[in-house]
Amino acid sequence: MKLIVLPVLVLTLFAVTPNAESANPLSAYEGRGLYVSYCQLCHGIRGKGDGPLAKAMEISEVNLTTTVRARSDTFLKRVISGKGRQTITGRDRHNLLSDSMPEWKDIFSESQLKSLIAYLRFLGNTKHDLMGDPEVGLRRYQQYCQVCHGLDGEGDGIMTKLIGIIPIDLTNSNETNRLSNVDLVKNILDGKGKYMPAWRGILSQSDVEALVSYIRLLSH
């Protein structure tokens, strides 16, 4: 009887699509949305300072992927929000601030600032480009992956208790960074090991690329 019930249970769980209230995307995912909406125009897709508005206004490029690494979250909040920005002097003012940098204190909440900084950290630390749309990736993750990998990607989904599997912790950047985008796409499409299913024929190539992009953000 167990041999019959378990496959039915697995298929049923994979078919469940959690509602929006169950979603709990991590900070970098939320920060990316803010960055795309408010920052990318000047700072560019990858944070290199080469956005179209910056070029049109002839603003000197600021490469965020290098400048954020040595700065604290508190410092970056001051730069972005404008609160206490006047106390920034010397090299930091020359390298990070310009008269064209808006003050976002009336736009971003504290939690939004935290999320935005998390995404800036991702841009500064990642070795891999986002190859698809993470928003699509989130939906596919909730639909197909969350049941094993867990709500936040920590490998603690309900299936781990039911059949004793131990999925990869997708929030571990050391683990995910060693895998290229090509590696992750292959693992998802073709499966890996005893318990990682092959999703070829179920997920499209674009779905998988979006999923990989969301996975990249889970670890930041």
Which ranges hold each PLM region?
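Stable alpha-helical elements in mature extracytoplasmic
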Residues: 27-30, 34-35, 71-76, 112-113, ...
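The canonical Cys-X-X-Cys-His
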Residues: 31-46, 116, 120, 137-152, ...
